[in-house]
């Protein structure tokens, strides 16, 4: 069986225009998730969260291939970001940020494979983060665009979305700011990083 690449199979969700915002209807999708708070560049809990997510995701991928013959490319890392005061998020005061890092899990991967992957990863990494879980995310209607460049340079694009695009379309916030990381920051120069910026919305009326 061919290896499934969800960036291609779900191309409307894992691609976006660079200089405009596309409207997408995101179905309910299953993710393995870890919550945290603080500056991701300084907080060791962030690094541990990402390590756990990848360990689990690859363990589930290999188990799926072995047990059911269904192989797939591990989807990209994604993150939900917010702050109690929206100005702290827009102002890049990262020490006040909260986050949920996550990786999508295909529907055909059963919970038993997650539990087995959890046990395997625990042997390697020790006790998991308390917030580690497998659960669905229901975003529905969203606006998204492709940002190319440093994560710290997203501000003007988000300001345009919040202050121009959303009011013009008569919509308001219906969920947390969502980022999909298409590039590996360990191997990609900051100015070439590709990140999908997504915002769940609903009618403002």
Where are these regions (language model features)?
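A solvent-exposed interaction/effector surface
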Residues: 1-205
């Amino acid at each position: 069986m061919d290896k499934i690449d969800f960036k291609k199979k779900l191309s409307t969700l894992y691609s976006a225009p660079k200089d405009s915002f596309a409207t997408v209807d995101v179905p309910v999708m299953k993710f393995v998730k870890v919550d945290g708070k603080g500056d991701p560049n300084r907080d060791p809990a962030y690094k541990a969260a990402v390590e756990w997510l990848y360990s689990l995701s690859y363990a589930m991928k290999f188990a799926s291939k072995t047990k059911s013959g269904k192989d797939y490319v591990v989807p990209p890392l994604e993150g939900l970001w917010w702050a109690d005061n929206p100005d702290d998020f827009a102002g890049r005061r990262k020490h006040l940020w909260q986050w949920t890092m996550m990786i999508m899990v295909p529907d055909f991967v059963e919970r038993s494979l997650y539990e087995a992957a959890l046990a395997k990863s625990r042997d390697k990494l020790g006790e998991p983060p308390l917030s580690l879980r497998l659960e669905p995310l229901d975003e529905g209607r969203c606006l998204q665009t492709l940002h190319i460049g440093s994560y710290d340079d997203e501000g003007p694009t988000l300001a345009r979305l919040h202050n121009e695009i959303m009011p013009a379309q008569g919509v308001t916030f219906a969920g947390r700011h969502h980022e999909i990381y298409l590039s590996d920051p360990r191997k990609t120069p900051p100015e070439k990083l590709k990140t999908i910026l997504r915002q769940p919305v609903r009618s403002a009326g």
